[in-house]
Amino acid sequence: MTVVPAQQGGGGARGTSGLYDVLELVLDRGLVIDAFVRVSLVGIEILKIDVRVVVASVDTYLRFAEACNRLDLEAGPRKDPGLPDLVGEMTESGARGKSKGALSGAAETISDALKGSSSGSSSGSSSRSTSRKKEEQE
């Protein structure tokens, strides 16, 4: 009777892999951890966390970003205005209204002064009250 010794190791080609082999595989295939968290309270964005951890070659990352349409996170018409944008718009509109009111008031005062010096003081006060009524209606 003949005894054949059992072979050690399975059907794998190589029994060990080093750190170099693991890094080569990760860089070739890529490892991407992408997380997006938004916390809103009553429609106001309180916290926004957008994290992307990439361990990959540049080519692998660019293929991933193109596939997910994530090359530029904040671009495009879908970008929601944040709190600084909203505050800035309100400040600009308020300043625009105040400057418009100040300029129209200055122009009105000058025109009243010119009318008052040529026609008398009684007609000037009535036109001034009429213009104030128009301003209040607007």
Curated annotation (Swiss-Prot):
Q: What's in the keyword line of the UniProt record? A: Gas vesicle
Disulfide bond sites: none
According to the UniProt entry, which residue ranges have a biased composition of type Low complexity?
116-129
Task: Summarize the record's induction comment.
Answer: Gas vesicle production is induced by growth conditions that promote production of secondary metabolites tiancimycin A and B.
Matches recorded under Pfam families: Gas_vesicle (PF00741)
Family, per entry? Belongs to the gas vesicle GvpA family.
**Note from the entry:** This strain probably produces some gas vesicles from the probable gvpO-gvpA-gvpF-gvpG-gvpJ-gvpL-gvpS-gvpK operon; it can be induced to produce more under certain growth conditions.
Described function? Gas vesicles are hollow, gas filled proteinaceous nanostructures found in some microorganisms. During planktonic growth they allow positioning of the organism at a favorable depth for light or nutrient acquisition. GvpA forms the protein shell. It is not clear what function gas vesicles perform in soil bacteria.
Q: What is this protein called?
A: Gas vesicle protein A
Species this protein is from: Streptomyces sp. (strain CB03234)
The primary gene name is gvpA
